[in-house]
Amino acid sequence: MVSLRDNIEVQPLSHNKRVRKNFGHINLVADIPNLIEIQKNSYEKNFLQLDTKDSERKNKGLQSILNSIFPISDPSNIANLEFVKYEFDTPKYDVEECTQRSLSYDSALKVTLRLSIWDIDEDTGSREIKGIKEQQVYMGNIPLMTKNGTFIINGTERVVVSQMHRSPGVFFYHDEGKVHSSRKLLYSARVIPYRGSWLDLEFDAKDIIYFRIDRKRKLYATTLLKAIGMSTEEIIKFYYDSVNYKVVKNKGWAVKFMPSHITAHRLTSDLIDADTGNVLLKAGQKITPRLAKKYAGEGLNNILVSHKALIGKYLSEDLKDPESDEILAKIGEMITVELLSVISDLKIKNISVLVINPQSGPYIRNTLFSDKNQDRESALFDIFRVLRPGEPANIEAAESLFYNLFFDPERYDLSEVGRIKMNSRLELNISDETTVLTTDDIKNILRVLVELKDRKGIIDDIDHLGNRRVRSVGELIENQFRIGLVRMEKSVVERMSAGDIDTVMPHDLVNSKILVSVVKEFFSTSQLSQFMDQTNPLSEITHKRRLSALGPGGLSRDRAGFEVRDVHPTHYGRICPIETPEGQNIGLINSMATYARINKHGFIESPYRKVKDGHVTDEVVYLSAIEEGKYKIGQANSKVDKDGILQGEFINCRVEGGNFVMVEPHEVDFIDVTPMQVVSVAASLIPFLENDDANRALMGSNMQRQAVPLIKTDAPFVGTGVEGVVAKDSGASVLALNDGIVEQVDSNRIVIRAIAQKTESAPSVDIYNLLKFQKSNHNTCINQKPLVKVGHYVKKNDIIADGPSTDNGEIALGRNVLVAFLPWNGYNFEDSILISERIVKEDVFTSVHIEEFEVIARDTRLGPEEITRDIPNVSEEALRHLDEVGIIYVGAEVKAGDILVGKVTPKSESPITPEEKLLRAIFGEKAFDVKDSSLHVPSGVSGTVVEVRVFSRRGVEKDQRAIAIEKQQIEKLAKDRDDELEIIEHFVFSWLEKLLVGQVSINGPKTVKTGQTITSEILKGLSKGQLWQFTVEDANVMNEIEQLKGHYDGKKEALNKRFATKVEKLQSGDDLPQGALKVVKVFIATKHKLQPGDKMAGRHGNKGVISRIVPEEDMPFLEDGTVVDIVLNPLGLPSRMNIGQVLETHLGWASVNLAKKIAGLVEEHKTKHASIEKIKKFLIELYGENINHILEKSDEEIISFCNEAAKGVYFATPVFDGAKVEDVKDMLRLAGQDLSGQVKLIDGRTGEYFDRLVTVGQKYLLKLHHLVDNKIHSRSIGPYSLVTQQPLGGKSHFGGQRFGEMECWALQAYGAAYTLQEMLTVKSDDVNGRIKIYDSIVRGENNFESGIPESFNVMIKEFRSLCLNVKLEVTS
């Protein structure tokens, strides 16, 4: 290990960064937001508010739930329990310890509660305080989130997936004509609260309006209006306008002329001006709205209509006799011929009539007259009977039920989002804090529903992202918490009324188990809390950014239709249109787009650049789907000049509804930030995505998540420029916490001296312990390798160590290999892949997989199980890998069947024969009392033991192995402490020397005289402890020395304290499950080399299985002798339409050949001492301006850069903005290659050229998780099914190969009767036949007899269950 004391010069780390030639044309103004902030913000910021002081906590998340549940009072109002504040303890174990010990990473929630007890005067009812007790109460452990946005539950890493659900609010829609045979549209409205009862309002085929509560029996909508306190008159006045008819002597009635109520139609009677008597239009002539407006403009105020025209109109107020005030007809009644004659007899001059015409239908009036309920009371009773059938109704119960349904904040919650949506849809102005329904809401929902029926307005699109919102982790757990606390509230009230309230303390009232069980249940069993996909860093990130429409309160797979699964125009820039699973979950599980974020209301937002008067600014604005509809948004690739002015006469823009229009530059409001914002992280890693068919792009993005981390990683030559971001945000790499200088590096840890802000204070030291060969959730290997050297200066957030599947800080899921597209002897038929032996020989695609095996020694009723080497009837050979305790050594090579941990279990005594008794008496044989229950390596597993962990229960004596492991861990901790102390001391004492030199000593060590000036020679002869003994004349310096000593002592004490705590944790024993005395975990690492049957894929959905490994000498090779690594079938391209892979291959070919060119120039520079300018010129030609920061450095650094580039030139071709065909040709031209990208290939077997030119190039291939080793197995004798007695199937059951129905047909077709009989009987489920055939084989005979198969007996039993007695009569 190297240390900084070896005087190595400090150099910045930045020169390690990889340079890529970028083909992107669009200037990025916004960085990709942190890819896992959706998880962290939701849980830590919004739910727990961990880093916020009590007084500054906002009323959201945990704070809001506790505020809403408390205060809790007892029924008699004597006691009152209030919430004051909450806090969290520091977790007992850190993340790594929790993973190792199979514990949950959580923290104790401590809530401060105040119990007030009141004295109530029985006579006057007045209350006064009797006593107040305040106490901190433990309310259970709450899981904490790790820095990577995951949870550790029982030692496994889990992710809570965000859920897409329908936003609370009101929705209007119709049935699309599906319900009624006439294809008539039946409109309906639905109010969906965040929690509480659903309210539906709907039309039926007869245009009567009904309502339902929670999908129960329907009632008339006017019953609901009456239940909220509206009278018939109020209902009619609210929903209808009225118009006045005045009688005109002997002519008819005069009525106000309203152009707005007129639609184009032919007149049935003359249009007469009532004031002048002029006929404006004759009957039969056509009137239009335009003509009507013209007449109104010319002064037409009233028109004359006949008596007949009033028939069929509805009264807008009660019709009374002018003399007696008697009501002749009620409001809303229809005017009939009889009523009209009464009106003329009584000489009534004025009649007010409802405006009901084609634009305003009579639906509410008709519903009102169908409804039998006349007042509020009868309406409430009606609702009560529907919701509580069979219960006796009284007005109090009915009122209370109706109030609790929609108006009680405890039981009904629209949420702030629901209120905002409701206000905007109904054009109301109710406060956001009102999260229950109001009477205005109900009245206006009905108004909008009727307007829709009258063809005004449009229905809502349920799949619009303005109507779907995301519930993230914080919110999901908040809902669980609320359930737990509501349950707990009931138990608190019970306990308050049960005991003597004066002596009770707050902690006696609270039962935290209720809350804990709810939270625990959510994390371990909820559909949305999932085992993290940890195959590689990309799969982790994608899992955390996933959006699921399934889960509690969501959709179910079977019910989800096509519309929900489909891509919607509002998905643009919010949800990826590409990445979704194939199969039944397609479209229900989505991924967030790269730049998308979730706003405080749960709606997904996408970023846009603001455009002012045709000038594109750098201001980035995030818009939700609702806001976006108001603007015209241009595409990211719209032409812009160097001043940011949009070019061209018209710009193609998106407007509401996903339509595209051409608008002038000054009308554009925003443009996209980058074309990449449309797709998800996985899709943005596919170069030339724009050249692939969408179905294949979907497979490509899904298969990248299945790539296994390889031993040797290799970033893609042809990338997209996003690789670095993914590696950084995934948490696989190690990032520097502070600026600093690397002090020490080895493969296990990196020590960095953080550069302090203030020079006087002692520096802090960051020690990064790297993960070595740890097992991931999917048994892949997590291993971190340092990237820094001693002396490197690192900045905060620099990548200092690579993790699995990362290379130099970029994600590297596969390897760059030389590929040729050509058919080769049929070995690449049907997408098979042919590989060269070099790939196996040089471990190009070799991966390490780690399996964990666990054995538990329990306390049984016959005595404790014991982990030991002393196992009955086991040979010494079988125990060769075990130590004296009975646990395998680290480094042992094991195969299936080997013993990993020796364990014996006591067995019950069986009666002993006299002979055995005698033997025991002679030999003292005790081994009969125990049976062997050792842990063996299961079938199909072999490899090397890489780690052993031993956990002992507290109070159980540790064995030697456990003590040895513990000692090793303590030594590691001590080394960390000593190194940290050494760095601090080095700094402190060199600073102290600086302060002392040149000062006059007043007091000090014996060797220094008083008044002597201190020199560095004097100090060299003193020990470190003696340096602190000086007192100097200068008071300021003395002050500084004291401060420095304070810092030093504080740091030293903190270090020792931390060390002691960790050691104590190690030595104290472990919390093991019930009954377990000792747990041993053994980890076996297996190397998987590439072999036939393994699945491989490119990034373009081009997948295949390896068919054959061909010796290098037989593979096709290039003219310079380079052997091709992989041969793919060219026929896999045309029908699949993923042309991106061809462009990738061509650009990869350019990359290799440019690298050769650079290597040639460097060689020329070394041997012929050619000028470095030639190299610089070539680099500028290749990289453009990207390379300026390299060219400014020294010649040595330029040459070192070229040496890296000589391994392969790296390109970045961002999606939808990458290299075009011309760019690829330019690169091939620069590399001196044929522009077709094809070369002459020579057949390795014959040495002859192939007939045609072949496409060859470097391509990025991945090895997928579907390894043949984990799939293939063979069975000799194994388990049988209990009922049918047929062998089981599948690898996990050690099953056989099923000879199925179709296979039987094949034998029947060949007439192979005996073979068929053998298959159906002795080789399957003829039990007696099986035993006999086994006997005959043992005897060396070859004859057998078929009996009756068990399945025949099963069939007879099934007949009997149908009461058919079938007997089998055997005739001799």
From Swiss-Prot:
Pfam family, one: RNA_pol_Rpb2_1
TM annotation in the entry: none
Keywords (A to Z) from UniProt: DNA-directed RNA polymerase, Nucleotidyltransferase, Transcription, Transferase
GO MF annotations, alphabetized: DNA binding; DNA-directed RNA polymerase activity; ribonucleoside binding
GO CC annotations, alphabetized: DNA-directed RNA polymerase complex
SUPFAM superfamilies: beta and beta-prime subunits of DNA dependent RNA-polymerase
CDD domains: RNA_pol_B_RPB2
Keyword Nucleotidyltransferase (UniProt): yes
Tree of life domain: Bacteria
EC number(s) on file: 2.7.7.6
Reaction(s) the record says it catalyses: RNA(n) + a ribonucleoside 5'-triphosphate = RNA(n+1) + diphosphate
Alphabetical GO biological process terms: DNA-templated transcription
Matches recorded under NCBIfam families: PRK00405.1, rpoB
Record function comment: DNA-dependent RNA polymerase catalyzes the transcription of DNA into RNA using the four ribonucleoside triphosphates as substrates.
Family, per entry: Belongs to the RNA polymerase beta chain family.
Quaternary context: The RNAP catalytic core consists of 2 alpha, 1 beta, 1 beta' and 1 omega subunit. When a sigma factor is associated with the core the holoenzyme is formed, which can initiate transcription.
Protein name per the record: DNA-directed RNA polymerase subunit beta
Protein's organism: Rickettsia bellii (strain RML369-C)
